[in-house]
């Protein structure tokens, strides 16, 4: 229902972004932390 009501209860503590789902907030937080959890299968890059 949040999609229809516009409610965004999850807020980023580093900027003004707000999110409907906590998973989207967690993904966004990587912008601020620099975390890159997925490695390339062919080389050492992330």
UniProtKB/Swiss-Prot annotation:
SMART domains: ZnF_C2H2
Gene Ontology annotations for the cellular component aspect, listed alphabetically: nucleus
Recorded GO MF terms: DNA binding; zinc ion binding
Keyword Transport on entry: no
Gene3D superfamilies from the UniProt entry: Classic Zinc Finger (3.30.160.60)
Keywords: Developmental protein, DNA-binding, Gap protein, Metal-binding, Nucleus, Repeat, Zinc, Zinc-finger
InterPro entries documented for this protein: Znf_C2H2_sf (IPR036236), Znf_C2H2_type (IPR013087)
SUPFAM superfamilies per the UniProt record, alphabetical: beta-beta-alpha zinc fingers
Protein's UniProt keywords contain Zinc: yes
GO BP terms in the entry: segmentation
Similarity-based family: Belongs to the krueppel C2H2-type zinc-finger protein family.
Protein name (database record): Protein krueppel
């Amino acid at each position: 229902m949040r999609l229809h009501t516009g409610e965004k209860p999850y807020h980023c503590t580093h900027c003004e972004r707000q999110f409907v789902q906590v998973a989207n907030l967690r993904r966004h937080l990587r912008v601020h932390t620099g975390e890159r959890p997925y490695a390339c299968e062919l080389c050492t890059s992330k």
